[in-house]
Amino acid sequence: ARDGYIAKPHNCVYECFDAFSSYCNGVCTKNGAKSGYCQILGIYGNGCWCIALPDNVPIRIPGKCHR
């Protein structure tokens, strides 16, 4: 497991707009992470950051997000 921005297909983050919302924690825990929160103004903008996300779940990597 590792920490990171959980990625949708095509290397895009799960966008979020409220640091205090439970949205990201839900997305992360549903995918097997211990927890998660909304990282505001991070390297990829506002995106969900997961703690202890399983290795088989994709994370955002450098390169383009292909919407």
Curated annotation (Swiss-Prot):
CDD domains: neurotoxins_LC_scorpion. Keywords: Disulfide bond, Ion channel impairing toxin, Neurotoxin, Secreted, Toxin, Voltage-gated sodium channel impairing toxin. This is Sodium channel neurotoxin MeuNaTxalpha-10. Belongs to the long (4 C-C) scorpion toxin superfamily. Sodium channel inhibitor family. Alpha subfamily. One of its GO terms (molecular function) is sodium channel inhibitor activity. Residues 2-66 form the LCN-type CS-alpha/beta domain. Residues 67 form a propeptide. Has the structural arrangement of an alpha-helix connected to antiparallel beta-sheets by disulfide bonds (CS-alpha/beta). It is found in: Secreted. Expressed by the venom gland. GO terms for biological process: defense response. SUPFAM superfamilies: Scorpion toxin-like. The keyword Secreted applies. GO terms for cellular component: extracellular region. InterPro entries: LCN-type_CS_alpha_beta_dom (IPR044062), Scorpion_toxin-like (IPR003614), Scorpion_toxin-like_sf (IPR036574), Scorpion_toxinL (IPR018218), Scorpion_toxinL/defensin (IPR002061). Disulfide bonds join 12-65, 16-38, 24-48, 28-50. Alpha toxins bind voltage-independently at site-3 of sodium channels (Nav) and inhibit the inactivation of the activated channels, thereby blocking neuronal transmission.
